[in-house]
Protein backbone atom coordinates (compact mmCIF):
# COMPACT_ATOMS: atom_id res chain seq x y z
CA UNK A 1 0.00 0.00 0.00
CA UNK A 2 1.37 3.40 -0.95
CA UNK A 3 1.61 6.33 1.43
CA UNK A 4 -1.11 8.93 0.81
CA UNK A 5 0.60 12.33 0.67
CA UNK A 6 -2.66 13.99 1.75
CA UNK A 7 -1.86 12.74 5.25
CA UNK A 8 0.96 15.30 5.41
CA UNK A 9 -1.71 17.97 5.79
CA UNK A 10 -2.98 16.49 9.06
CA UNK A 11 -0.11 14.60 10.69
CA UNK A 12 2.52 16.26 12.85
CA UNK A 13 5.67 15.29 14.65
CA UNK A 14 4.65 13.69 17.96
CA UNK A 15 7.59 15.36 19.72
CA UNK A 16 7.38 19.01 18.63
CA UNK A 17 4.05 19.02 16.75
CA UNK A 18 5.92 20.42 13.75
CA UNK A 19 5.58 19.72 10.06
CA UNK A 20 6.77 16.40 8.63
CA UNK A 21 8.30 15.86 5.21
CA UNK A 22 7.89 12.74 3.10
CA UNK A 23 11.05 10.86 2.12
CA UNK A 24 9.79 8.62 -0.67
CA UNK A 25 13.13 6.89 -1.28
CA UNK A 26 13.38 5.67 2.32
CA UNK A 27 9.64 5.43 3.02
CA UNK A 28 9.73 7.63 6.09
CA UNK A 29 8.49 10.94 7.42
CA UNK A 30 11.13 13.41 8.52
CA UNK A 31 11.00 16.03 11.25
CA UNK A 32 13.87 18.37 10.47
CA UNK A 33 13.40 20.32 13.71
CA UNK A 34 13.96 17.26 15.90
CA UNK A 35 16.13 15.43 13.35
CA UNK A 36 13.96 12.32 13.62
CA UNK A 37 12.68 9.90 11.00
CA UNK A 38 9.43 7.98 11.35
CA UNK A 39 9.02 4.79 9.34
CA UNK A 40 6.09 4.17 7.02
CA UNK A 41 4.94 0.54 7.16
CA UNK A 42 2.51 -0.64 4.49
CA UNK A 43 1.46 2.95 3.83
CA UNK A 44 0.89 3.75 7.50
CA UNK A 45 3.22 6.18 9.29
CA UNK A 46 4.48 4.94 12.66
CA UNK A 47 4.40 8.19 14.62
CA UNK A 48 5.71 6.91 17.92
CA UNK A 49 8.60 8.75 19.53
CA UNK A 50 10.17 5.52 20.79
CA UNK A 51 10.12 4.07 17.25
CA UNK A 52 11.72 7.11 15.60
CA UNK A 53 15.28 6.93 14.36
CA UNK A 54 17.86 9.71 14.26
CA UNK A 55 17.87 11.52 10.92
CA UNK A 56 20.93 12.95 9.26
CA UNK A 57 20.34 15.20 6.27
CA UNK A 58 23.52 14.02 4.58
CA UNK A 59 22.52 10.34 4.77
Curated annotation (Swiss-Prot):
GO terms for cellular component: cytosol. It holds the Pfam family Trm112p. Signal peptide: none annotated. It comes from the Bacteria. Belongs to the UPF0434 family. PANTHER family: PROTEIN PREY, MITOCHONDRIAL (PTHR33505:SF4), ZGC:162634 (PTHR33505). This is UPF0434 protein Shew_1640. It comes from Shewanella loihica (strain ATCC BAA-1088 / PV-4). The lineage of its organism: Bacteria, Pseudomonadati, Pseudomonadota, Gammaproteobacteria, Alteromonadales.
